[in-house]
Amino acid sequence: MAKGDKFYYDNFAECASLAKKAAAYLVECLENYDLSKIEKMLEEMHTFEHSADMKKHEMNEALAKAFVTPVDREDLDLMSQQLDTVLDLIEEVLQKMYIYNIKTIEPAAIDYAKRLVKACDILGDIIAEFENFKKSKKLHALIVASNDVEEECDKLYLTTMHELTKNSTDVLTTLSWYKIYDCFEACSDACEHVSECVGSIVMKNT
């Protein structure tokens, strides 16, 4: 591998690591939820998102200067954006809880957050294999596993939204959780989009 190529894969690996940390921190926040401490939680969560933004800027600068890239620069740019979106959306879950002044956490939210940890763990494995995608014997199975987790999240979303509507007693609370669960679903979709991007790159370059 050319020395310059390693930058791209390392950058993606660092972003995937940040996503794993952010997802794990979200679970920690929800399992130990305290509305009086949510501003501090948001500050901590933002450090992960900000670090991911910096990695995206580094990628943009490198792509702008590069004469040759290991795969199409448009694909590298798209993947960088999609990884950043994962971090943005994980942070947004907590932001919405602050916006809607959520006082207690629904069990389904913790369940969803734990599935996001699983999705981000698989994403980290995919990115680790991506560096050697032409020889990897694991990458296809990992992409399938990522899709499986997204399907689990889809099922959880449908069940949770049904129960939320069926048991609704307060419009504001129902609307608040509706928006939060939408954000959880967007998170799981974003993880799958990264894995699909990797799959597309592999298909075009092997």
Task: Kindly label every feature range from the protein language model.
Residues 1-206:
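Cytosolic, long alpha-helical scaffolding segments
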